[in-house]
């Protein structure tokens, strides 16, 4: 019984987090609410970040590039509330009590849904309708980029990552981190499926489908290392047919100084 107890506690806590983080989207309309519930419930990355301790208590200033309707901001706020109320599982690592969130999203419809749904959160999230290739990035401790960097060409990808590195460096946090989920183009079948689903979801959300530029995992890793990151990779497509990989890129200490 003791062997299953931690999982039971964690599952119950995750269900509570899911309800709390998605409830605000009822104010954004039926689509916003159902999309939030499906995304948080079916995409393994959110719970994976939490249970692996990849969002640390030192990560107070968070930048979410390609934030969509701001689901990550709502999750962070719900995590903080659960900890404050003393219902945080002992197997989960603590996170920042009052994270300062900046979300950057190109699509005006998504930003509007985010404003309608989570604009009331405290601290108030900063939600910018802007292009990640040109948006000003504030000094920060943690940058999250999930499944969006492939929408710009290879040169632009590197330019975005250079600016991310510089924003983390300016933040001066020795725990500075980039969480980057990408598709591994060397896994042809999984990558093709993920691209097809990506295009389908983009259409459903009412957006124009753009061309994409992928890289093999080895190239993503080499690029990040050349920019001064220490990189480890984790499969992050459990329960799906995709070839998604999470790259945990910690800024080398001499880069953060």
Question: Which residues fall in each region the model found?
Answer:
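A conserved beta-strand element that flanks and buttresses the S-adenosyl-L-methionine
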Residues: 144
């Amino acid at each position: 019984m003791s062997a299953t107890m931690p999982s039971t506690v964690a599952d119950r806590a995750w269900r509570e987090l899911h309800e709390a983080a998605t409830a605000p989207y009822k104010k954004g309309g039926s689509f916003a609410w159902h999309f939030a519930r499906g995304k948080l419930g079916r995409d393994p990355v959110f719970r994976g970040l939490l249970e692996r301790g990849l969002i640390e208590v030192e990560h107070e200033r968070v930048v979410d590039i390609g934030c969509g309707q701001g689901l990550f901001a709502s999750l962070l706020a719900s995590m903080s509330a659960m900890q404050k109320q003393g219902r945080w599982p002992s197997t989960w690592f603590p996170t920042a009590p009052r994270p300062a969130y900046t979300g950057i999203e190109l699509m005006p419809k998504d930003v509007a849904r985010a404003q309608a749904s989570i604009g009331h959160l405290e601290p108030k999230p900063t939600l910018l309708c802007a292009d990640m290739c040109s948006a000003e990035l504030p000094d920060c401790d943690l940058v999250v980029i999930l499944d969006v960097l492939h929408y710009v060409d290879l040169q632009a990808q590197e330019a975005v990552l250079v600016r991310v590195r510089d924003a983390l460096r300016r933040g001066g946090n020795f725990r500075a981190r980039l969480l980057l989920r990408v598709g591994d183009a060397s896994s042809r079948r999984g990558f093709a499926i993920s691209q097809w689903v990506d295009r389908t979801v983009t259409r459903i959300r009412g957006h124009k489908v753009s061309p994409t530029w992928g890289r093999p995992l080895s190239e993503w890793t080499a690029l990040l290392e050349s920019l001064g990151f220490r990189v480890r990779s984790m499969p992050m497509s459990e329960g799906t047919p995709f070839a998604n990989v999470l790259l945990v890129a910690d800024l080398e200490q001499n880069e953060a100084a």
